[in-house]
UniProtKB/Swiss-Prot annotation:
Source organism of the structure: Naja atra (Chinese cobra)
Top-level division of the source organism's lineage: Eukaryota
Name of this protein: Probable weak neurotoxin NNAM2I
Stretch forming the signal peptide: 1-21
GO cellular component: extracellular region
Pfam family, one: Toxin_cobra-type
Tissue: Expressed by the venom gland.
SUPFAM superfamilies (alphabetical): Snake toxin-like
Coiled-coil blocks: none
Family label: Belongs to the three-finger toxin family. Ancestral subfamily. Orphan group II sub-subfamily.
Localization terms from the record: Secreted
Known function: Binds with low affinity to muscular (alpha-1-beta-1-delta-epsilon/CHRNA1-CHRNB1-CHRND-CHRNE) and very low affinity to neuronal (alpha-7/CHRNA7) nicotinic acetylcholine receptor (nAChR).
Disulfide topology: 24-45, 27-32, 38-63, 67-78, 79-84
Length: 86
């Protein structure tokens, strides 16, 4: 009898939308294992590749409110699901 109220509480907590926070990878290496929790308003994960000189790439990853712009020799990929900026 006591398990029914407990079950209802658990189901209610699981079903409620308690707020969704996006997580994105955030490190300068090619293979990244670190991630960050995005702040309120940041709904985009991005990966920017910048070619500094031939055969030298710099990786920049993180959260953003909008997809970052590009400059010459940059490539930017944006996405909107957890850890999608691999």
């Amino acid at each position: 009898m006591k398990t029914l109220p407990l079950t209802l509480v658990v189901v209610t907590i699981v079903c409620l939308d308690l707020g969704y926070t996006l997580t994105c990878l955030n490190c300068p290496e090619m293979f990244c294992g670190k991630f960050q929790i995005c702040r309120n308003g940041e709904k985009i994960c991005f990966k920017k590749l910048h070619q500094r000189r031939p055969f030298s790439l710099r990786y920049i990853r993180g959260c953003a409110a909008t997809c970052p712009g590009t400059k010459p020799r940059d490539m930017v990929e944006c996405c909107s699901t957890d850890r999608c900026n691999r």
